[in-house]
Amino acid sequence: MLKKNDIVEVEIVDLTHEGAGVAKVDGLVFFVENALPSEKILMRVLKVNKKIGFGKVEKYLVQSPHRNQDLDLAYLRSGIADLGHLSYPEQLKFKTKQVKDSLYKIAGIADVEVAETLGMEHPVKYRNKAQVPVRRVNGVLETGFFRKNSHNLMPLEDFFIQDPVIDQVVVALRDLLRRFDLKPYDEKEQSGLIRNLVVRRGHYSGQIMVVLVTTRPKVFRVDQLIEQVIKQFPEIVSVMQNINDQNTNAIFGKEWRTLYGQDYITDQMLGNDFQIAGLAFYQVNTEMAEKLYQTAIDFAELKKDDVVIDAYSGIGTIGLSVAKHVKEVYGVELIPEAVENSKKNAQLNNISNAHYVCDTAENAMKNWLKDGIQPTVILVDPPRKGLTESFIKASAQTGADRIAYISCNVATMARDIKLYQELGYELKKVQPVDLFPQTHHVETVALLSKLDVDKHISVEIELDEMDLTSAESKATYAQIKEYVWNKFELKVSTLYIAQIKKKCGIELREHYNKSKKDKQIIPQCTPEKEEAIMDALRHFKMI
């Protein structure tokens, strides 16, 4: 039985989702940092229990031909670049495999082609935002990054994947904090003033925002500090202060102050100008975010008469990018400042057909349904936890033709796609996009398309009355939905209405592009909703 500090020869057979090497010894699975498949190593046992263990490389006996020999190991130890030891082409293959595996293991999907991960031409120095802790190390104020799985600061000046100008601003601020003798935060003692430095830089504009995260409002000689850093970096247009006096791992507190200039920077995305506030979500890799959003737009095959819902809309980047190509855009975002940014960004780009609300995505979707808004396309870009079940059901109930799902967590995306399939949607396309080179993270765009009503014959249901038969012309689908809601407070989908119409012998216009699948799984209308729809059909004298 292996025990701590034993040294054993092993072969690495796989990588975990987070990029650790996997070795198998005596029926145990070991996870080893900085080890790649096909490598043979001498491994020192760090920790072991009944089924798994952790080890570290003592010596490489055989190295992988795909190893990046030039990586500074500090980037591995800190987690900044937890896949940086793997050559970039192999990183892309690894990410494609992660997407395929998650879709198969979680959603049971194996018959949809997953495209090769879309990579970056120069996969370093891309991050447009830095969040850097400030701590005391060996008696000196330092900036850097925490060692992986700890709060021990590793001093760093070059962050490898960040915009080099941002790195320079961080170093300049560090030196000024030392010069003005401002005390770094001490987590154990709950003392000190400066907790974090946050720096944003526009990829195209070059505008810079600096955020000082402090434990209390008063910062001694802060005006002089700001004056000095602006002398070095005149591109700074915003200096903000965030006050966080809580014993928490969260970076930001609730109170914000503008110390210099404006409370935002401006940058461009897909040809539009965007104001970006300190707290607003904005993709950290502008170059690849444009490719990500363009992929989602291309997947959705937008038309002039489309009505688009932009869920988790942030500051409006994707919704405003499509607004000029569609009839209407309705966006929802939970962060009030981001919603205000969205509205300002719409004005900034002379866009009048984009409408934004501050709410949860599921509440907004329900309210839009009540208001009779009938989307044809839904764009979702949720946080890592994915979509809620109530949102998925509400979005499916709209009967939208296409759902473009942008995901930063393929596991939750696969889970959500499984539910969408149960509600009558089919996964059509999947494209991974590498927004975070040198790390294990991957973004994915998936296209879901609404299945047709019949299990064996595709039937197209047109909401435009020009395409309705004479039997259907007495009421539109929207009118039937409104009637059912007003009388029964039940929400019914276009799919359910079509099923009951068909059951009643009302002719539906058949679509000549018949489905090639003989056994599609289609959700069926519940008895309660069937009776409500029947009542509506009788009301409109359709039966």
UniProtKB/Swiss-Prot annotation:
Residues annotated as the enzyme's active site: 408
Entry's EC annotation: 2.1.1.-
Enzyme class label: transferase
Residues annotated as binding S-adenosyl-L-methionine: 283, 312, 333, 381
InterPro entries tied to this protein: MeTrfase_TrmA_AS, MeTrfase_TrmA_CS, NA-bd_OB-fold, SAM-dependent_MTases_sf, TRAM_dom, U5_MeTrfase_fam
UniProt domain TRAM: residue ranges: 1-59
Pfam families, per the entry: TRAM, tRNA_U5-meth_tr
A Gene Ontology biological process term: rRNA base methylation
GO molecular function: rRNA (uridine-C5-)-methyltransferase activity
Keywords: Methyltransferase, S-adenosyl-L-methionine, Transferase
Family: Belongs to the class I-like SAM-binding methyltransferase superfamily. RNA M5U methyltransferase family.
Protein name: Uncharacterized RNA methyltransferase spr0932
Organism the protein comes from: Streptococcus pneumoniae (strain ATCC BAA-255 / R6)
Highest classification ranks of the organism: Bacteria, Bacillati, Bacillota, Bacilli, Lactobacillales
